[in-house]
């Protein structure tokens, strides 16, 4: 009887140790793909996708935004590519905890082009990337939110749709 109790306790302990982790797999979400800008959005409830709507914009289709992209690497760097040959790198960090899902960029460096000369969507994207504090998403899309969780940019992995 004592052996059964010990065995049962060991199985229960093992189940507790291998239980579900309520955090995101950061590398599988962000790395290994090129993320293309799909649009700029506003929301009243960041947990409810039905509460968001696109901000007015002068682009005609999502293909107009395909030149705006980010590639995240497992070493913690990101390459941001914008029109006019402008490329920047930054360090990125994400916490996949279900309650927080924090995200940040730091240590920006210009690789090519002149970010000061950017206008339109390129300037808007770069300005918003520098204010990103939170994220939501999966391996198909990511949303990068500002500190208020009211404005976000959505990016898509277009290879998933080809």
PLM regions and their residue ranges:
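Sec-dependent bacterial lipoprotein signal peptides
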Residues: 1-18
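Lipid interaction determinants
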Residues: 20-91, 95-162
């Amino acid at each position: 009887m004592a052996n059964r109790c010990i065995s049962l306790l060991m199985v229960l302990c093992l189940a507790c140790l291998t239980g579900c982790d309520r955090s995101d797999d950061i590398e599988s979400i962000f790395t290994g793909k090129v993320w293309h800008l799909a649009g700029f959005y506003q929301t009243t409830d960041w947990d409810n996708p039905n509460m968001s709507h696109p901000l007015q914009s002068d682009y005609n289709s999502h293909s107009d935004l395909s030149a705006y992209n980010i590639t995240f690497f497992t070493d913690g760097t990101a390459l941001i590519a914008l029109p006019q040959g402008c490329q920047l790198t930054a360090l990125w960090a994400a916490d996949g905890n279900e309650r927080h899902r924090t995200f940040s960029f730091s240590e920006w460096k210009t690789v090519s082009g002149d970010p000061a000369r950017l206008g339109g969507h390129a300037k808007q994207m770069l300005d918003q990337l520098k204010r990103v504090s939170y994220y939501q998403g999966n391996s198909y899309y990511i949303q990068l939110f500002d500190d208020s969780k009211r404005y976000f940019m959505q990016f898509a992995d277009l290879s998933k749709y080809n």
